[in-house]
Amino acid sequence: MALIDQVKRKLNITWSDEDTEERVKDIIALAEPIMKRKLGISASASYDFSIPGDENMLFLAYCLYEWNHTTNEFDENYANEIAECRAIHEVAHFVETEGENDEQA
């Protein structure tokens, strides 16, 4: 399912109008770099938040908080999940860069 459709489902949007569609697109565009930073995903990396998993769950939750203008509560409510995802991505990045350093040596 496309990310925009997942977000609409999470937000319980069952109607279709141009203003709502644009707002959802704006929320997704805003959420992508924010969630990459929070989760330790390189800003330059392309990441598909539509793939089921913890990152997808957190992305959709962040969109819900943004929809309701309550993003100030997101970090506190999802701190453990964010930390777990961040640790996984930081280890993956370390292994990736360590491998590059070994090849250069």
Where do the PLM segments sit?
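Conserved short "hinge" loops at termini or chain/domain junctions
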Residues: 1-53, 88-105
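Alpha-helical structural signal
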Residues: 24, 60-61, 78
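Mid-chain, well-packed structural core segment of small domains
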Residues: 40, 47-71
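C-terminal structural segments of small proteins and small subunits
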Residues: 69-87
